[in-house]
Amino acid sequence: MATTVAIEVSNLSKSFKGKTAIKNVYCSINEGEMVALIGASGSGKSTLLRHINGLHIGDAGTVYIFGTVLQSKGKVHSKITSLRSQIGCIFQQFNLVNRLTVIENVLVGKLARLSILRSILRLFSKEEKAQALSALERVGIIEHAYKRASKLSGGQQQRVAIARCLVQGAKIILADEPIASLDPESARKVMELLVQLNRQSGITVVASLHQIQMVRSYFDRAIALRDGEVMFDGATVELDDKKLNEIYGTAAEELVMRGHGELLV
């Protein structure tokens, strides 16, 4: 069976106010892969993720989503909204609306697929609400469906964000430091949930992480950035101490698992 490429980034470069953020980045990620994005703070991880979902537009290079150009040479595809509907995003700060209930936050994932009127008025059908409840059950927090999002713990809020991706119908999940602000147990649950969605539903997952032990435990492949350039793309079993020091350089102290008190190199 032919392999489908979910994400392809070709010669992508971006500068902000004259400072290079990413330079000539190339990577290809197949549908159903689970890939860690690693590197020191400021290495370009978040910038790369934001180009993949079209939030940032590169100065040069091309991003393809399932073989269709999302952006190329500073221009976006005319149907970028449709392409982006295939990409779910979760962030360190969860990006929930605290005053809304959990189920209302999950239903936000449907907005891009609704008519303008239904989107503005947030008119959801019984079927759509049932889908939201099903997603909450799948991530293990259905009992919190009608609580305000602000009442949930950090780990629970991150699972709400994942449920939102499911309701959106995302084929790709981009996770930007999804466990950075979580306690060890919550971090483990979030990572296990992402692995479950990847293995059971074939959702392509790309996650930027600082916690190298998590990378080794949950990912088979890692892409490493240093100063905006790809300097490693391979199996996580190859990430020995020497390679990690090359990737992180003087920022090797970032390999301390935050909040876990464990030095990883």
Swiss-Prot record:
Annotated S-S bridges: none
Domain ABC transporter, chain residue ranges per copy: 7-252
Keyword Transport appears in the UniProt entry: yes
Documented EC number(s): 7.3.2.2
Membrane association type: Peripheral membrane protein
Domain of life: Bacteria
Binding site for ATP: G39, A40, S41, G42, S43, G44, K45, S46
Function: Part of the ABC transporter complex PhnCDE involved in phosphonates import. Responsible for energy coupling to the transport system.
Oligomer and partners: The complex is composed of two ATP-binding proteins (PhnC), two transmembrane proteins (PhnE) and a solute-binding protein (PhnD).
Similarity-based family: Belongs to the ABC transporter superfamily. Phosphonates importer (TC 3.A.1.9.1) family.
Protein name per UniProt: Phosphonates import ATP-binding protein PhnC 1
